[in-house]
Amino acid sequence: SSDLLSCNPQSEISKITDLTIEIDSGPELLAGSTRLKSGTAQKMVLNMISTITMIRLGKTFGNLMVDLQITNGKLRDRAIRIVEKATGASRAAAEKALSESGHEVKVAILMLLLNIDADLARERLRASQNRVREALN
């Protein structure tokens, strides 16, 4: 499949693509520049597409990105804050749940919201295609 994202409506190439997204961002402030309005418009569309993809893949819970690999201190702190926000738990409780979950954010969230252990949380995630919201039901 060939897809096209263009700020040039009715371009010749759009006639041969399977999916065409055309943005009419109007003329650039500086003629010949493609990094101002049209580049910004394309970036916004790509951000929307990637956000929708993350939601459909179950990598979010509410407005939180919860499918996070903790590989450094900064990401560890982010994971703690995500668990806190998702559950309303204290920082200490979020840290404990993350530790007991093997540093899996989704597992820690389920552990705290459902008051279950890590193994049961993982089982519920597997049964719900790794989606936190569905695993809660």
What does each model-found stretch correspond to?
Residues 7-63:
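Short alpha-helices
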